[in-house]
Amino acid sequence: MAGETSFKYIVRIAGVDIDGDLKLPYGLASIKGIGYTTAMAVIRMLGLDPEKKVGFLTEEEIRRLDEVLRDITQLGLPKWLYNRRKDYETGKDLHLIGSELIFYARRDIEREMKIGSWRGIRHKYGLKVRGQRTRTTGRLGMTIGVRKKR
């Protein structure tokens, strides 16, 4: 049994259930906070085969991936690949994944709203934040459309 490789249909990496049929980069990209490019960089740094399916990973490879994904900064990847550079409180370059990423994003929006910045005000009123037009798009409710005359 030692030489036999078993296929797992669902693999848990970084607290996320990943479909075993996916190739490694696409499987890792299904984790929130990790895109295809970051996944490929991590795979190359660990010396894994990008064509390998997630279900064929050994327990040791899963453990190594899990360990590295908890702190991607230890791999020495370029800073532009991180998703949180120059953190507001610490000033450090971080790479967040999963619920931690959601928590930090929500906290940033709350801070913007509290200080009363333009972005914060737009968020507070539920309007578009990034300069999109609002005259015709982004209307909430009012979905009657055209009514036939009786």
From Swiss-Prot:
What InterPro entries is this protein classified in?
Rbsml_uS13_C (IPR027437), Ribosomal_uS13 (IPR001892), Ribosomal_uS13-like_H2TH (IPR010979), Ribosomal_uS13_archaeal (IPR019977), Ribosomal_uS13_CS (IPR018269)
Q: Which family does it belong to?
A: Belongs to the universal ribosomal protein uS13 family.
Task: Check the record and name the Pfam families matching this protein.
Answer: Ribosomal_S13
- Give a GO molecular function annotation for the protein: rRNA binding
Its cellular-component GO annotations read:
cytosol; small ribosomal subunit
According to its UniProt entry, the function of this protein is described as: Located at the top of the head of the 30S subunit, it contacts several helices of the 16S rRNA. In the 70S ribosome it contacts the 23S rRNA (bridge B1a) and protein L5 of the 50S subunit (bridge B1b), connecting the 2 subunits; these bridges are implicated in subunit movement.
**Protein name, entry field:** Small ribosomal subunit protein uS13
Which processes are annotated in GO (biological process)? translation
